[in-house]
């Protein structure tokens, strides 16, 4: 069995698919009970439940990897189950945390509060790989033999952090419960549509996974034909998602009854935007390692960018820089939360991004050359200009950074060397503030449907399970660098979303 490709497919599907399944189960149960379960719990309690479920997932890891040896397939599937449980908990946390953060103050600054929360998360994803390498291997380089006993301790620590966070929320008296008693209106049409979508996706992915469980064809023509069929199955699941949302968008505009939160066009458009945004954020870095490792010029040992092919150890600093770019943008986007004076805010918009970049360089001390630091510093300056032009306007921010992100991907496609490499890496920087902008715009004006709408948006984190494997298949069939046209198309939709949502919200205000 070819575990390399199946591994990436299953890990993405188990984790990001759990967001979709968790939010879908919550929605179906609410529909059956004829009350919004999350509204009944309240945002605060919902977040606590999510943290506790994720705790269970982290604890499941302990017996799964107890005495495990590298390469054991049964251990791999046990890890997938644990990841799925963690993802289910995250699904509840996201469903509650995002509208909760928006509701804590002026809705206009809701995206800034989401940026603040996201900035903390991004710091974790930046230092996380280094911390894991140090704990498991005893070095920051990630070289050596993994010790599973240390991994057990790591997951116990993660479980303890989840419990600590849950305790903070539970005992905090200053945080509102977020309970609402709005009457529940069934959304049966939306429920049946989502169930049908789920069936289609499971058929598509199930078939793809099955093809990896049987011997690969030895005849080149048959192997190539199978790759195209796998790609077709993955694209079918993508079309099913887009088609379902478009169907709801069209049908609810003529008769809103039975569609629930999906009757609001800003939500339907936002669901596809979240799907696309998460997909592009995950797929850029998921395939970046392969771009840097895959040898295309065997004589000179060069990769597709014309740079020396790297090992897993060599690419770690670039993956850290990619996630660090997300941290830079979110720290900068959160400045408005602290209500600085106009003059101080302008200064902070320049200083904070470089402080965040300094943190990245520090945690990767000695890894980056001066040339790499200068190149990324210039890219950070471009983002700073974007923030000044956007002026905290969510729609303007989306437009600007989606356009810059699209341009960056095109530069990566049509150039080579460090310019192409850093163009792809900059995708993290320009994606960084999109989640809060999309989320706050999508739930604007939903009223009693806010928690249901939030649940629908969380379902669309599914993009992280569908878009990366599509790019991976395109890379297998064509070339890894050309597969980044997938990212170009994602940014193109985000530009379109910004314009369409601006029109929709303008009409509703009038």
Task: Give, region by region, the residue ranges found by the protein language model.
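Intracellular juxtamembrane helix-capping segments at the cytosolic ends
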Residues: 92-109, 288, 432-447
């Amino acid at each position: 069995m070819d575990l390399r490709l199946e591994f990436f497919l299953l890990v993405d599907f188990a984790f990001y698919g759990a967001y979709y399944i968790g939010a879908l189960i919550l929605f179906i149960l609410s529909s059956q009970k004829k009350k919004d379960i999350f509204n009944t719990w309240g945002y605060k309690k919902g977040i606590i439940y999510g943290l506790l479920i994720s705790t269970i997932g982290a604890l499941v890891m302990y017996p799964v990897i107890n005495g495990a040896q590298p390469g054991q397939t049964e251990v791999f599937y046990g890890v997938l189950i644990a990841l799925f449980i963690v993802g289910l908990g995250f699904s509840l946390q996201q469903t509650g945390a995002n509208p909760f953060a928006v509701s804590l103050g002026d809705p206009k600054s809701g995206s800034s509060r989401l940026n603040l929360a996201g900035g903390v998360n991004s710091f974790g994803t930046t230092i996380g790989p280094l911390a894991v390498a140090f704990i498991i291997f005893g070095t920051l380089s990630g070289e050596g033999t993994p010790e599973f006993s240390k991994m057990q301790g790591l997951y116990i620590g993660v479980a303890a952090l989840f419990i600590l966070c849950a305790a903070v929320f539970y005992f905090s008296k200053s945080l509102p419960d977020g309970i609402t008693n709005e009457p529940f209106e069934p959304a049966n049409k939306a429920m049946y549509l989502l169930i049908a979508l789920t069936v289609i996706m499971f058929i598509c992915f199930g078939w793809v996974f099955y093809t990896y469980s049987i011997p690969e064809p030895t005849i080149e023509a048959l192997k190539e034909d199978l790759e195209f069929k796998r790609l077709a199955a993955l694209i079918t699941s993508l079309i099913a998602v887009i088609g379902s949302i478009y169907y709801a968008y069209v049908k609810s505009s003529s008769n809103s009854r039975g569609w629930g939160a999906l009757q609001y066009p800003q939500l339907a458009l936002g669901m596809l935007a979240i799907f696309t945004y998460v997909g592009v954020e995950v797929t850029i870095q998921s395939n970046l390692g392969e771009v840097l490792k895959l040898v295309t010029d065997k004589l000179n040992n060069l990769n597709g960018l014309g740079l020396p092919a790297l090992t897993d150890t060599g690419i770690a600093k670039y993956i850290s820089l990619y996630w660090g770019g997300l941290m830079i943008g979110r720290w900068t986007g959160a400045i408005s939360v602290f209500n600085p004076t106009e003059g101080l805010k302008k200064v902070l918009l320049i200083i904070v991004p470089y402080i965040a970049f300094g943190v990245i360089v520090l945690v990767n001390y000695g890894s980056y050359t001066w040339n790499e630091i200068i190149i990324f510093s210039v890219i950070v300056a471009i983002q700073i200009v974007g923030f000044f032009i956007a002026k905290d306007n969510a729609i303007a921010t989306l437009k600007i950074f989606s356009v810059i992100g699209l341009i960056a991907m095109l530069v990566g496609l049509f150039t080579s060397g460090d310019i192409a490499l850093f163009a792809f890496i900059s995708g993290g920087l320009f994606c960084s503030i999109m989640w809060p902008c999309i989320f706050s715009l999508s739930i604007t004006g939903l009223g009693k449907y806010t928690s249901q709408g939030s649940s629908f948006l969380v379902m669309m984190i599914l993009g992280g399970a569908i878009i990366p494997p599509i790019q991976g298949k395109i890379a297998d069939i064509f070339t890894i660098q050309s597969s980044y046209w997938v990212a170009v198309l994602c940014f193109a939709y985000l530009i379109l979303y910004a314009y369409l949502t601006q029109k929709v919200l303008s009409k509703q205000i009038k």
